[in-house]
Design a protein with these regions (language model features):
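Extended alpha-helical scaffold regions
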Residues: 1-298
């Protein structure tokens, strides 16, 4: 409480320059993890530390992955609180630093496809993605992230790799159609749950009202990639909805992208085995697709 009361903007910046004071910031972060009900440590981080880009950069560099997860969890939680308070959580430059951490190390999450993987390093990427999704959800103070030089291309590339990895072998990135109430142990809490859907969400956010990014997605063959993820996937709830949202943003006021969609050819109905397993079938009538319940045997 005393530290919180004594801190101001100038004193916070001094933590960057002094090794002993930097160790104190890491100790405070450790208390946030081990004693989450201790409000004052959370206040120190959210009301002082997060206001300094250089301190965030320095702390993040010195932290273990476990400590980074605590910091990212606080940032994500505060994004919702700050939205209600109409206050700025952190400077744009700090958000750009987090975006660069995601672009530089995003491929770490691919290690989750193997049994021997560093879950904490991958979890850091997953939390970074969730934060970036929230920051780019029409938050004016962070929408300049749309102009980040590598964020969109890195996100599309990562989606490509994950999509191919899930198709080429059976692993945590493979689409699943298990909608029973009793799913395999750990399926509902696996860290990769919804990761692919959130990649598509971020792409949609970055393309909203941004012609340059819309064109970039087309040039990277990202439109077909997103369309290929419109199927229902129990490992990625709402992925089809995020895909539709992303396509809408990619096509908005973009004639070239609209022409690409118009040039697609219909190749018949997709495999509806999964729908039939849920008691439904797809019926084509007058150029439209209808969802019908399966007829029960008498």
């Amino acid at each position: 409480m005393v530290i919180h009361t004594c801190l101001d903007e100038h004193k916070t910046e001094q933590f960057v320059e002094d090794t002993q004071r930097l160790k104190l910031t890491l100790k405070i972060m450790d208390l946030c993890r081990t004693l989450p009900d201790l409000d004052w440590t959370v206040f120190i981080v959210t009301q002082h530390f997060l206001k300094s880009t250089e301190l965030i950069r320095k702390m993040y560099t010195e932290m273990t992955n476990e400590e980074r997860l605590t910091l990212l969890e606080l940032i994500l939680a505060q994004l919702g609180v700050v939205e209600e308070q109409k206050d700025c959580l952190m400077p744009l430059s700090a958000a750009q630093f987090l975006a660069s951490c995601f672009t530089d190390h995003g491929r770490t999450v691919l290690s989750l496809s193997s049994e021997a993987s560093d879950n904490q390093a991958a979890l850091v990427i997953i939390w970074l993605l969730d934060i970036l999704c929230e920051m780019t959800s029409d938050r004016k103070e962070f929408m300049s992230l749309q102009d980040h030089p590598d964020l969109l291309s890195a996100t599309v590339d990562l989606l490509k790799e994950i999509h191919l990895l899930g198709k080429n072998s059976r692993n945590v990135f493979t689409a699943a159609h298990n909608f029973t109430l009793t799913r395999p142990e750990g399926a509902e809490t696996h860290p990769v749950l919804s990761f692919k859907a959130h990649l598509i969400r971020l792409i949609g956010n970055l393309c909203h009202g941004h012609v340059v990014n819309q064109d970039k997605v087309r040039e990277m063959d990202g439109i077909a990639l997103i369309l290929d993820n419109c199927s229902i996937d129990s490992n990625n709830p709402f992925i089809s909805q995020w895909a539709v949202f992303a396509i809408r943003n990619i096509l908005e006021h973009n004639l070239e992208n609209q022409k690409l969609i118009q040039g697609l050819r219909r190749q018949g109905l997709a495999d509806d085995t999964m729908l039939r397993g849920m008691g439904f079938r797809v019926e084509e009538r007058d150029g439209s697709l209808l969802l019908r319940p399966l007829k029960k045997d008498p």
